[in-house]
């Protein structure tokens, strides 16, 4: 039993460490297609499997306090008990990371969008109608650059995901992008006339 628990812990811990490390590395490198594949493709599978492992461990090696009074408690060695606790802890870490990863993604998308808007969005007089003879017929260069750098990469990565996994990432990035744009407009006090 000890060997099986040890193998289970080593496997789930290695998979969890690899996935979390890759996700953070891809996001830091702004490699959004890879980030989305890992977090929206691989992470749900890891979460499902760690949940199943947690249920199996809890069913096979219940906590002494969780054992019904009519059943004799399973005697666990100290090492078995520690391994079970570590498996449950790793499963809980996967759960937490799964809940936090889109927030982390959204925050970085908003930061990246804000940087692009700060660097490229025209200010002041550019937006006054009197300086232009006609309305624009194509997107502004700043808008195209920001959309390609943020939204374009997410769309590229989302295409590789199953349909049901695309919506959360697309919703988060669109919201973050528009919030950054609105924050920039308000901070710079840009008036459209």
Please identify what each model-predicted range represents.
Residues 1-193:
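Extended alpha-helical rod/solenoid/coiled-coil scaffold segments used as assembly/tethering elements
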């Amino acid at each position: 039993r000890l060997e099986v628990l040890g193998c289970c812990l080593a496997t789930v811990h290695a998979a969890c460490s690899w996935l979390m490390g890759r996700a953070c590395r891809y996001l830091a490198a702004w490699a959004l297609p890879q980030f989305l594949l890992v977090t929206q493709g691989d992470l749900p599978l890891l979460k499902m499997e760690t949940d199943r492992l947690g249920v199996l461990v809890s069913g096979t090696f219940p906590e002494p306090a969780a054992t019904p009074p009519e059943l004799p408690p399973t005697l666990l060695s100290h090492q078995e008990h520690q391994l079970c606790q570590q498996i449950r802890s790793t499963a809980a870490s996967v759960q937490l990371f799964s809940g936090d990863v889109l927030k982390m993604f959204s925050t970085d998308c908003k930061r990246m969008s804000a940087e692009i808007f700060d660097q490229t969005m025209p200010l002041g007089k550019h937006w006054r109608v009197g300086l232009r003879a006609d309305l624009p017929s194509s997107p502004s260069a700043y808008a195209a650059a920001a959309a390609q750098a943020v939204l374009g990469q997410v769309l590229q990565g989302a295409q590789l995901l199953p349909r049901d996994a695309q919506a959360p990432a697309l919703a988060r990035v669109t919201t973050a992008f528009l919030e950054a744009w609105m924050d920039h407009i308000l901070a710079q006090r840009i008036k459209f006339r």
